[in-house]
Amino acid sequence: MELHDIREDYTKRELSEKHCAADPIKQFEKWLKEAIWAKVNEPTAMNIATVGENGKPTSRVVLLKEVNAQGFVFFTNYLSRKGKSLAANPFAALNFFWPELERQVRVEGHVVKLDEIKSDEYFASRPYTSRVGAWASEQSAVISGKNVLLAKAALVAAQHPLNVPRPPHWGGYIVEPDTIEFWQGRPSRLHDRIRYRLENQIWVKERLSP
């Protein structure tokens, strides 16, 4: 299947150094708000790439649940493939893609677990069925069929009809960035790329060639 004729010219916006915030987290928050206002589909969805102890990269899409001065927060099963990869190699790369705005944001950094209190607070805010699912799903494990999963979910619901506690193998991570890049599509593939990199605890802002 040939795909070389599929292309699009980007013309909607531009990105200049002088209009970028000094702090990349502030710049990200600005872009995220604009993505939400523009009704981008799943504006908080981000691809997260990890590398396990075997040296092989894997990626998947998860949802950003908080962004703050420290970094980017998401939640998952610690025993999942991504959880095992992060235990062996606590670094990750994130990518947000907002095609409606012809934008993407790349983030690289060190990953640490959130404390149990924060994980408990977020877990308690989830819908009941999602909390049940966190117990029922042994994420990334091979199962014989969907009925196995449904049976586990029914058992958990029967055991916890009102309140489902957080499983010890489920909780949050924060990606503490050392690099954040903002990409704005431009005509003729002369895209705008503004990268922030952390140098001696100070963010250095620079333009990259597309």
UniProtKB/Swiss-Prot annotation:
For this protein, the Enzyme Commission number is 1.4.3.5
Q: Where does FMN bind?
A: 60-65, 75-76, 81-82, 104, 139-140, 183, 193
Which residues are involved in binding substrate? R7, E8, D9, Y10, K65, Y122, R126, S130, R189, L190, H191
Can you supply a Gene Ontology BP term from the record? pyridoxine biosynthetic process
Keyword annotations = Flavoprotein, FMN, Oxidoreductase, Pyridoxine biosynthesis
Q: PROSITE patterns, from UniProt? A: PYRIDOX_OXIDASE
Reaction(s) catalysed by this chain's protein:
pyridoxamine 5'-phosphate + O2 + H2O = pyridoxal 5'-phosphate + H2O2 + NH4(+); pyridoxine 5'-phosphate + O2 = pyridoxal 5'-phosphate + H2O2
Which pathway does this polypeptide act in?
Answer: Cofactor metabolism; pyridoxal 5'-phosphate salvage; pyridoxal 5'-phosphate from pyridoxamine 5'-phosphate: step 1/1; Cofactor metabolism; pyridoxal 5'-phosphate salvage; pyridoxal 5'-phosphate from pyridoxine 5'-phosphate: step 1/1
Could you say which enzyme class this protein belongs to? oxidoreductase
Q: List the disulfide bonds.
A: none
Summary of the function given for this chain in its UniProt record: Catalyzes the oxidation of either pyridoxine 5'-phosphate (PNP) or pyridoxamine 5'-phosphate (PMP) into pyridoxal 5'-phosphate (PLP).
Question: Which family does the record claim for this protein?
Answer: Belongs to the pyridoxamine 5'-phosphate oxidase family.
What is the protein's given name?
Pyridoxine/pyridoxamine 5'-phosphate oxidase
Question: What gene is this protein a product of?
Answer: pdxH
